[in-house]
């Protein structure tokens, strides 16, 4: 699968976004267990979509032959060297790591797990574009401080 470029605010990957990066020289994702999940893309400045590539844009690519395509957010674009830039992107899940959550608590009930997850979303300092769900039905209390 060729990598596809999307605008920073895209939430669906079911189209070709800003365009397919057919001119990409290489595109490799690296996932370390309990560690980083990053993508490195090399692209020529003469490529059809070079002008569209910007910080915070999303690149959707297959991390390997078996997994589904995954979105990665661009955080670094190198200066051109011999007409080629190196683009670094982190998996979109890293967007959550910079979003602080205000304190809240959930009392024990049959919906405590889902209520706690919704509390994380509604009490986030910045708007959270992610949705949360679980099939865990454990009855327990939760407190975020």
Regions found by a protein language model. Give the residues of each.
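Assembly/oligomerization scaffold segments
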Residues: 1-107
């Amino acid at each position: 699968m060729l990598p596809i470029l999307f605008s920073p605010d895209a939430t669906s990957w079911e189209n070709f976004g800003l365009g397919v990066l057919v001119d990409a020289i290489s595109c490799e994702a690296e996932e370390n267990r309990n560690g980083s999940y990053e993508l490195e893309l090399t692209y020529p400045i003469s490529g059809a979509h070079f002008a569209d590539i910007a910080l915070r844009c999303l690149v959707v690519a297959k991390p390997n032959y078996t997994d589904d395509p995954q979105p990665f957010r661009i955080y670094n674009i190198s200066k051109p060297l011999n007409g080629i830039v190196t683009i670094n992107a982190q998996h979109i899940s890293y967007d959550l790591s910079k979003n602080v959550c205000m304190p809240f608590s959930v009392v024990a009930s049959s919906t405590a797990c889902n209520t706690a997850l919704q509390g994380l979303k509604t009490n986030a300092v910045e708007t959270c574009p992610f949705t949360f769900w679980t099939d865990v039905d454990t009855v327990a209390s939760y407190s975020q401080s």
